[in-house]
C-alpha cells in the first residue's frame, strides 16, 4: 500500500482501492486533493515540501506575508472575526515574474502553518473543495487550513465561478487561509482581485 495516499470513505457502499489507506483524521502536512464525482469521494495524497527551494527573499515581502500569517494564527483574531459575525479567513495574492521567490515564500508559509498543526491543500480544483470541506468539517472542524492556488490566472480562466464561491461565496471555510500566486496579474480580472476579496496583494 502506498503510505503517501489516504482516503476518506463517504459512501457506505463504496470500497476504496487496496492501494489506498482509509484514515479517520488527517495529520498536519501538505496534501494533494483528488475528487471522484462518480463515487463522491475525496482522496488526500501526502506531499513533501521542497526545502531545497528556500532562498533569500526581500525582507519586506516576506515580513508582510508572515505578519498576515501570525495575525491569522492568533486566537484573539478568530474570536474577533466571530464577534463581528465574519468567517475567520485570510486571502493573499502574490504576483510577479517567474523567479521572484513566490514559490519559496509559499513553502515557508506552508511550513509555518504545518508547525501550527494546520493542513495544507496544494493547488486543488476549486469545484472539489466543497466536498473536501464537508469531510474536514465532519471530522476535524477546528483545524486550520491553508489552500495554495498556483497560477491563479489559470484557475480563473477555467473555474472562475467555483473559485469565487470558495474565496468569498457559498463554499467558505472557517479557519482557512488562501494564498494564490500569479506570474501575470494583468490576466486576473480586477473584479476577482479586488481589495475586498484579498486582504493582501503583494
Kindly label every feature range from the protein language model.
Residues 76-84, 165-177, 188-191:
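Conserved Walker
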Residues 102:
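Conserved lysine of the Walker
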Residues 1-76, 82-84, 88-89, 94-99, ...:
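AAA+ P-loop ATPase mechanoenzymes
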Residues 90, 145-146, 177:
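The start of beta-strands in P-loop NTPase/AAA+ ATPase cores
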Residues 149-150, 176-183:
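Structural recognition of the conserved hydrophobic beta-strand(s) that form the central parallel beta-sheet
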Residues 114-143, 160-161:
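Short glycine-rich substrate-engagement loop in P-loop NTPases that contacts/grips substrate
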Residues 190-202:
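A short helix-turn-beta junction within AAA+ P-loop NTPase domains corresponding to the substrate/partner-engaging
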Residues 108, 143-172, 187-189:
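Conserved AAA+/SF3 P-loop NTPase catalytic/coupling segment centered on the Walker-B
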Amino acid at each position: 500500500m502506498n503510505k503517501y495516499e489516504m482516503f476518506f470513505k463517504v459512501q457506505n457502499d463504496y470500497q476504496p482501492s487496496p492501494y489506498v489507506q482509509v484514515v479517520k483524521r488527517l495529520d498536519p502536512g501538505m496534501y494533494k486533493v483528488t475528487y471522484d464525482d462518480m463515487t463522491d469521494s475525496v482522496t488526500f495524497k501526502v506531499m513533501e515540501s521542497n526545502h531545497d527551494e528556500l532562498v533569500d527573499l526581500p525582507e519586506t515581502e516576506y515580513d508582510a506575508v508572515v505578519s498576515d500569517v501570525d495575525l491569522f494564527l492568533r486566537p484573539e483574531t478568530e474570536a474577533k472575526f466571530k464577534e463581528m459575525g465574519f468567517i475567520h479567513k485570510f486571502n493573499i495574492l502574490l504576483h510577479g515574474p517567474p523567479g521572484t521567490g513566490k514559490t519559496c515564500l509559499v513553502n515557508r508559509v506552508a511550513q509555518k502553518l504545518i508547525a501550527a498543526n494546520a493542513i495544507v491543500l496544494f493547488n486543488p480544483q476549486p469545484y472539489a473543495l466543497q466536498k473536501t470541506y464537508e469531510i474536514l468539517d465532519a471530522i476535524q472542524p477546528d483545524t486550520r487550513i491553508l489552500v495554495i492556488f498556483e497560477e491563479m490566472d489559470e484557475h480563473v480562466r477555467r473555474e472562475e465561478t467555483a473559485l469565487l464561491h470558495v474565496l468569498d461565496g457559498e463554499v467558505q471555510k472557517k479557519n482557512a487561509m488562501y494564498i494564490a500566486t500569479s506570474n501575470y496579474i494583468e490576466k486576473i480580472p480586477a473584479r476577482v482581485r479586488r481589495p475586498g476579496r484579498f486582504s493582501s496583494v503583494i
